[in-house]
């Protein structure tokens, strides 16, 4: 058969899954074999098989904030899932496991530790997740996207993103010749962000017509009708879609993005070279989205606007103060933060650990 076998452990959110898929592509391009350890009834169960990757699942859910009964059952659940993960590792003769985060990462990593299989972890957020914090004690390599997530030397590799985003022309080239209204992209994730859907149309309505940017607004699943109705009722022109299938073109054409501050979003903004008005999701575990946003803001690549301070009046004030020159400067600063070879760096670290 040739090549080594790697088990990727990632699940729960796209922020864990899509960076892992980029690493899977890099490993397979080098002639290696990849299997995936995920959770049952999960996002990864819907996504991963589409990429031709063998998916194995464990029956495990998160423990933070859940009821006392589930917490009391945790030792039993952990024992059962670790045993099942050991069976999967033996069955596929896994030579290295790579943990990206999510509920499944800890039992999979513990199983690898007990079997003497090397562990590599990659942390996508500025604040390390619970599973990765535990596994870092046993990992042969600790890799991370933000400088302060861990302190392990040589571990800063950035977040893996799609090559077609990293390969976009530099901001100065994209912005050349642009005139007229700013073009602003609004994305709140695949489910949308109700606060953005509500506030952005109201903010634009407060601006004079000739000062309003051109808007391309992703509503999120099931919210297109209500979003378009809000824009129409306020007399504001906007192009609204439920879900953007071609994010590369959306990034290419935008002058600025209004968005949340998930790890994958930050990685794509820096890879593309785009400034942003960042409204972190306030209920994220350990408030990691605020820490992610500060990474861009400290580089003068955008503004952090806490959701508690997000009003139509405040957003209108910010939008009214923007011009293309400022957006270009933010975009150029964002691009300096990019680490475009992240997927290959993670893959090569894992290959070295499996040797």
UniProtKB/Swiss-Prot annotation:
Compartment(s): Cell inner membrane
Record flagged with keyword Transferase: yes
One GO CC term, this protein: plasma membrane
Topology class, membrane: Peripheral membrane protein
Stored Pfam families: Glyco_tran_28_C, Glyco_transf_28
E.C. code: 2.4.1.227
GO MF terms, alphabetically ordered: UDP-N-acetyl-D-glucosamine:N-acetylmuramoyl-L-alanyl-D-glutamyl-meso-2,6-diaminopimelyl-D-alanyl-D-alanine-diphosphoundecaprenol 4-beta-N-acetylglucosaminlytransferase activity; undecaprenyldiphospho-muramoylpentapeptide beta-N-acetylglucosaminyltransferase activity
Class of the enzyme per the UniProt entry, highest EC level: transferase
Protein's UniProt name: UDP-N-acetylglucosamine--N-acetylmuramyl-(pentapeptide) pyrophosphoryl-undecaprenol N-acetylglucosamine transferase
Organism classification: Bacteria, Pseudomonadati, Pseudomonadota, Betaproteobacteria, Neisseriales
